């Protein structure tokens, strides 16, 4: 275990749950932060509560290191963002080559606010679930963006901050495998049953890969990754 404290950007989805488990294996104390920005899939905020409770109940060693959860009201982001994540509109590609689920500046703002909380609480490692492999092309998920942001935050705060992105260079199948290696089949099942990824907020029938509509970009990535992981894991 690494000495020190970390703050995890935690949405209640598969990726951030895996990153939270990763942090709990590595740091003496871990806190979480979430954001309510009027997202259409608001059910993810309920999922994050369920996931935190399940982690505390099923993983005693992690529970001892899991500290406070911080929820930030970012309604203003929803007010200035006309996207399929904050409006009841169909998901489609834009002329810029990005899906209209892209909320401009979202991750930049998330990390800035996380750093402000971390500054106050002595949490100088910020952990996020961004990646450049199985992703929708969002520019604020790119490694170069986050490295530049790490420098800007450290300069602007007058303290050294580190941004950790454990999933940056692995695909969704490898993300499922990371979860299994961190917490065994119990963590995998927790992710299937309790986390939420679907952009449409569907919590109906439980699929092998979890809840969701099965059609939106988030569900498609999660489903395909689970199928590849299952094929590899059972081969």
From Swiss-Prot:
GO terms for molecular function: ATP binding; ligase activity, forming carbon-nitrogen bonds; zinc ion binding. Its EC number is 6.3.4.20. GO terms for biological process: queuosine biosynthetic process. The keyword Glycoprotein does not apply. Binds 1 zinc ion per subunit. It comes from the Bacteria. It catalyses: 7-carboxy-7-deazaguanine + NH4(+) + ATP = 7-cyano-7-deazaguanine + ADP + phosphate + H2O + H(+). Keywords: ATP-binding, Ligase, Metal-binding, Nucleotide-binding, Queuosine biosynthesis, Zinc. The keyword ATP-binding applies. ATP binds at residues 10-20. It holds the Pfam family QueC. Zn(2+) binds at residues 198, 213, 216, 219. Pathway: Purine metabolism; 7-cyano-7-deazaguanine biosynthesis. HAMAP family: QueC. NCBIfam families: 7-cyano-7-deazaguanine synthase QueC. This is 7-cyano-7-deazaguanine synthase. The lineage of its organism: Bacteria, Pseudomonadati, Pseudomonadota, Betaproteobacteria, Burkholderiales.
